[in-house]
Amino acid sequence: YFQSGVAVPLFSLYSKQSIGIGEFLDLIPFARWACFCEMNIIQLLPVNDTGAESSPYSARSAFALNPVFINVQSVEGSSEFSDEIREGKLEFDALENIDYYKISTWKRRILRKIYDLNYKSIKKDEVLLGWIESNGWAKAYCVYCTLKAQNGEASWKDWTNYKDPTEKDIEKLWVKYGKDCLFQAWMQCIAEMQFNAAVAEISKLGLRLKGDIPILINEDSADVWAERRYFSLDDRAGAPPDMFSYSGQNWGFPTYRWDVVEKDDFRWWKARLAQASKFYHAYRIDHVLGFFRIWSIPEREVTGIMG
């Protein structure tokens, strides 16, 4: 059975309706083009939240979507800031390259203004509250993002407090910083709705969306911060020396403590794959071999030689 498709990073897929970078809703016109070309599959690079990082493979959450891909004009309440949004679009459209950090910062600022203006109704939104309850990773992620912002985006390892939080700590912080935490959840809820709208159109056209799941996760992430027991912070993953790199590779990501993961019935990985299945008809794990063996390097090493 012959299959044809296209692999594309979402950030490169920007259209006339998007602002400075590809967005979830840009998948809709792209899917129509792919259908016209008689393609079957659209494959994306990871679309998880990377914070200030531009690499899609350096996520700060294995579950959360990247708010930079939200189409702000489609968000309820955005009309109050139409002039500011229009000015931002003109500025970013004039750039030759994607200014990832600037666009990400600008979008979060606009979304925060919309959120603050409509906070009284948003905090009672049953859809949002239901989304929080149905996503077990949400509170830890939202608290992590809130604390990270309060600490000038520094790594959790450099925070003064809450470097190793308990579940009670996370619940307490969720209440203490309720408005800021809810803002993070609200952005995620919007991102999911827009992504789901695009996926629905892709499915309607008879196409399939394929995702990309990096097997590793950034040390400075909500997952490593809140689920520390699953990760070995004394080790870094990489590759041994070969004909392409005499010193090997050190990717800088912690390895898994598979004995702990297994003892917990692979709960975290099951949840991660279930999250991906909400959006993708298929997905690639990069790289699946890492489930069986991986080059592990002592944390203090710079190269991959001593693995």
Name each model feature, range by range.
Residues 1-227, 261-262:
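Acidic/aromatic-lined carbohydrate-recognition and catalytic surfaces
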Residues 39, 280-282:
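A structural motif
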